[in-house]
Regions:
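Catalytic Zn2+-binding segment of zinc metalloproteases
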Residues: 312-328
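Active-site-proximal segments of metallohydrolase catalytic domains
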Residues: 215-291
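Beta-strand-enriched, solvent-exposed domains that form extended recognition/catalytic surfaces
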Residues: 26-150
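Solvent-exposed loop/turn segments at secondary-structure junctions
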Residues: 183-186, 224-228, 282-286, 302-304, ...
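Fold-level signature of zinc-dependent metallopeptidase catalytic domains
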Residues: 151-207, 220-230
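Bacterial Sec-dependent N-terminal signal peptides
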Residues: 1-22
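Short pre-active-site segment immediately N-terminal to the catalytic Zn-binding motif
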Residues: 189-192, 287-311
Length: 423
């Protein structure tokens, strides 16, 4: 009798979990456009626009769980019951900009776009931004009623042309990635498709992507630009491109990004996507990856393949940079706070990281010696800090472009994320 009751409880629990998406959501995407603005002392979040597009390509399970903590979170609550029915995490260029000196002198605004499943009933949506001490810096809550006549319908007609590059084994439980062309004229789209093939080959040469390839759906979106290439402000070069990308972001010559997130998602409206890889038609070195926002990389440099994979580590799984600068403007990771990223530590709470992968008698910190070259340890120098922040192995795809693979800790983190979305 006890076994029967236990079976009923487990079955009912699983049934409720399976039904939770259909209980609260329709098979459509609610795209919410925000403006984040302010300076180092005061930040503000404002609602810009609401949009609805056909089908939902994000997670259908574990709706109220976060894949990783991130530097910000979006939470959807049922208005009547106050139950949390969807959550996701993210990072933004706005938060990164706040760490630069310019943020001490002036205010700026940044576009941000988030996707959630379209609710069946009224919901309360909260956006939280956190500082580098993992404290909530600013919070904003607003209400969305699905019948609002000002919710703009997009992606139902006149979709951007796209090519299916990879078909998953199970289209109902897969990870949807969209490559999008930036700085490619219409006549250059065959080149773009070849560039997508090249970087896909690089990504799926790395574990765990290689062994879990059948869990991914990939499309190549042929967004045309009037000009070929990308803008280079330091050289006085400005191009008219689909996403208005440019080098010199935050006055860093190799930092290649786009600030036009509404344009990005307009091009993608109605197309199967959740994660985004932007390929920029340039042979100059540069790129950037932002958690659950986008990965943007140059397409025609000798290091394109490792850079695209590295930046996807950021945008897809929230992995931290494992390299260090001799001189950094502001420490990104306070040494008295444990970072949320799984591949770096300050040793404040090392048990929450890769302590279980450390072999007995391993010195902590671990000496950077030839004998320890392939050994999981605690090596000083990571997260842009020479001192006080540590990485799992001497080298990794998240540290250099030369290392051929992700380290053991990063592979585990990536595997966990893939399972999170697909199991």
């Amino acid at each position: 009798m006890k076994k029967i009751c236990l079976f009923i409880v487990i079955f009912t629990s699983l049934q409720l979990k399976a039904q939770s998406f259909d209980e609260y959501f329709t098979d459509n995407t609610l795209r919410i456009d925000y403006i984040f603005s302010g300076d180092v002392n005061h930040q503000q979040i404002a609602l810009d626009k609401l949009n609805c597009s056909p089908h939902w390509y994000g997670k259908h399970k574990r709706l109220s769980e976060l894949p990783v903590e991130g530097n910000g979170q979006i939470t959807v609550r049922d208005h009547k019951s106050k139950a949390v029915i969807y959550r996701n995490s993210f990072s933004t260029l706005f938060q990164e900009w706040l760490s630069y000196d310019e943020a001490k002198k002036t205010s700026r605004s940044f576009e941000n776009v988030f996707l959630v499943p379209m609710p069946k009933d009224t919901v309360d949506i909260t956006i939280e931004l956190k500082n580098n001490r993992r404290e909530t810096q600013v919070s904003f809550t607003h209400q969305v009623t699905p019948g609002d006549i000002l919710i703009r319908k997009i992606g139902y007609n006149n979709r951007t042309p796209f090519v299916q590059m990879l078909t998953p084994k199970d289209s109902t439980n897969c990870i949807h990635i969209a490559y999008i062309a930036e700085g490619y004229q219409t006549s250059e789209m065959p080149t773009f498709i070849n560039d997508v093939k090249n970087t896909m080959e690089a990504l799926f040469a790395h574990e765990p992507f290689k062994s879990m390839k059948d869990r991914f759906s990939i499309v190549a979106v042929e967004a045309p630009s009037k000009d070929s290439g990308t803008s280079e402000p330091s050289k006085g070069i400005w191009k008219n491109t689909a996403l208005s990308s440019h080098f010199d972001t935050f006055y860093s010559d190799r930092y290649l990004t786009t600030l036009n997130l509404k344009d990005l998602h307009d091009w993608l409206a109605g197309i199967p996507y959740e994660h985004i890889i932007v390929l920029v038609n340039t042979n100059h070195y540069g790129g950037g990856g932002i958690l659950n926002s986008y990965n943007l990389s140059m397409a025609h440099h000798r290091l394109t393949r490792p850079v695209v994979v590295h930046e996807f580590g950021h945008s897809f799984a929230g992995l931290a940079d494992e390299y260090a600068y001799e001189a950094e403007q502001i420490p990104m990771y306070p040494h008295d706070i444990e970072p949320w990223e799984e591949n770096i530590t300050t040793l404040v709470d090392f048990k929450s990281k890769w302590n279980d992968l450390i072999k007995k008698n391993t010195l902590i910190p671990t000496p950077t010696t030839p004998a320890n070259k392939n050994k999981v340890g605690v090596y000083e120098g990571a997260g842009y800090s020479v001192k006080g922040v540590y990485r799992p192995m001497q080298d990794c795809r998240m540290r250099t472009n030369e290392n051929p693979e992700f380290c053991d800790v990063c592979r585990r983190a990536l595997t966990k994320i893939i399972d999170f979305y697909t199991k």
